[in-house]
């Protein structure tokens, strides 16, 4: 009898699948990645995620499992928990959430009941699907009311949010965004929540790495619960994380994750989270996070100086910014597709007070975490901005687009990802 262990590696056993994986490896190696929610993990993170831990079921929590043989995964998960607590200065951490959306769902379950009113950032203003979109579980389960940004500054107006909170009397206020380029004042959000007797939950998925490094204000001592992903700027595996300083809420969070939403945790992913947390605890990670901010500011400044483009809110304080491209190309979708052709990857994105369809949009979203992971700096960030502009302005000139492709290849060859 031939055992499955005799099948060899993926390349030998499943050529069709391997070809797709290899093609993706080549794409990542030779494309400039500017999707703000993506990053490049270390080989150590990938090794942990591909370990034998994938074989082990471990329903429950360390020291209190429903299965035997969990003494090793208890060590793994405890390492992840303790490192997360240290990294963010939190008293309690749940590392089992499979994703940021699962983390948000668990936080809602811990804090409020179905039908309760929640004040969250409107998707069109930079919020996330799980902040109350009507097509998402959050909007279907709870009564979300959206707050927006100021029409003139395109930034959060905390006085207006306070007045809105007074009017709707939410049980929960959600702060955090997926497409907001400015620093968020969590202290002001907590004051608003306290004023109306609401809980404050912060979704820091996009900025977690910046928070961990101390280059962005932390929400941990202001929010009742903080949720996050472990990828994006934190540069770990795809997964979720929940933090709190309240012991009673920690118990509710744990119950909401298991058995409320999930069964067995993904211990191989939790191991990869533990590796990423250790990487982020290294002093060098602060330099990396600051470089993300510096690179993003440098790239955004190039667009700000070109009157054919409009930089949303006029600048950026973090890893991301939005650009209105409609003076040079019809919509963001066309811009995204065109840039794909020259091996620059980013996404179309609605801008505040959007007038186009969400499937087209007026803007594009640009993030610099992934290029910073490759070692690119301010000079390269400025070059990339000029390449984007060159491609968009000359979107019907194939000769010029080919020039951009060649310049992109020169950059990626100079800053290899895994082929070092």
Curated annotation (Swiss-Prot):
What GO cellular component is one of the record's annotations?
cytosol
Question: What reaction is this protein's catalytic activity?
Answer: (6R)-5,10-methylene-5,6,7,8-tetrahydrofolate + glycine + H2O = (6S)-5,6,7,8-tetrahydrofolate + L-serine
Keyword check for Amino-acid biosynthesis, yes or no. yes
Q: Which Pfam families match?
A: SHMT
Q: What is its EC number?
A: 2.1.2.1
SUPFAM superfamilies attached here?
A: PLP-dependent transferases
The positions annotated as site (Plays an important role in substrate specificity) read 231
Recite the UniProt keywords alphabetically.
Answer: Amino-acid biosynthesis, Cytoplasm, One-carbon metabolism, Pyridoxal phosphate, Transferase
Q: Which domain of life is it from?
A: Bacteria
Secreted in keyword set: no
Q: What is a biological process (GO) this protein takes part in?
A: tetrahydrofolate interconversion
Compartment annotation: Cytoplasm
> What is known about its subunit structure?
Homodimer.
What PANTHER family does its record include? Answer: SERINE HYDROXYMETHYLTRANSFERASE, SERINE HYDROXYMETHYLTRANSFERASE 1
Q: NCBIfam families, per this entry?
A: PRK00011.1
Q: What is this protein called?
A: Serine hydroxymethyltransferase
Q: Which organism is it from?
A: Streptococcus pyogenes serotype M12 (strain MGAS2096)
């Amino acid at each position: 009898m031939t055992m499955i262990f005799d099948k060899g590696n993926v390349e030998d056993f499943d050529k069709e699948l391997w070809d797709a994986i290899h093609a993706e490896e080549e794409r990542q190696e030779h494309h400039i990645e500017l999707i703000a929610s993506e990053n490049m993990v270390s080989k150590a993170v990938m090794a942990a995620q591909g370990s034998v831990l994938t074989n082990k079921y471990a329903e429950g929590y360390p020291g209190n499992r429903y299965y035997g043989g969990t003494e090793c995964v208890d060590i793994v998960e405890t390492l992840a928990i303790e490192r997360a607590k240290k990294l963010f200065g939190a008293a309690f951490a749940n590392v089992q959430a499979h994703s940021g959306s699962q983390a948000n769902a668990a936080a809602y379950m811990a804090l409020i009941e179905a039908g309760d009113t929640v004040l969250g950032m409107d998707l069109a203003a930079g919020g996330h699907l799980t902040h109350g979109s009507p097509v998402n579980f959050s909007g279907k389960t709870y009564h979300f009311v959206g707050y927006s940004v100021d029409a003139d500054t395109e930034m959060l107006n905390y006085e207006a949010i306070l007045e809105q909170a007074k009017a709707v009397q939410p049980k929960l206020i959600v702060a955090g965004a997926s497409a907001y380029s400015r620093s968020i004042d969590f202290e002001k959000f907590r004051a608003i929540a306290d004023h109306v007797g609401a809980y404050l939950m912060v979704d820091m998925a996009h900025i977690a790495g910046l928070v961990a490094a101390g280059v962005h204000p932390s929400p941990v001592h202001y929010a009742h619960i903080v949720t996050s992903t472990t990828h994006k700027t934190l540069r770990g595996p795809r997964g979720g994380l929940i933090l709190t300083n309240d012991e009673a809420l920690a118990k509710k969070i744990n119950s909401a994750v298991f058995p409320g939403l999930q069964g067995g945790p993904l211990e191989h992913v939790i191991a990869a989270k533990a590796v990423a947390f250790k990487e982020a605890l290294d002093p060098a990670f602060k330099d990396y996070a600051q470089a993300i901010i510096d690179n993003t500011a440098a790239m955004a400044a190039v667009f700000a100086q070109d009157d054919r483009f409009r930089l949303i809110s006029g600048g950026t304080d973090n890893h991301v910014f939005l650009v209105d491209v409609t003076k040079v190309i019809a919509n963001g979708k066309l811009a995204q597709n065109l840039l794909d052709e020259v091996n620059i990857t980013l996404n179309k994105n609605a801008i505040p007070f959007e007038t186009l369809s969400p499937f087209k949009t007026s803007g594009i979203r640009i993030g610099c975490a992934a290029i910073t992971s490759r070692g690119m700096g301010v000079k390269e960030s400025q070059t990339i901005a000029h390449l984007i502009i060159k491609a968009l302005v000359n979107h019907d000139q194939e000769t010029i687009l080919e020039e951009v492709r060649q310049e992109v290849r020169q950059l990626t060859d100079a800053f290899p990802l895994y082929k070092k």
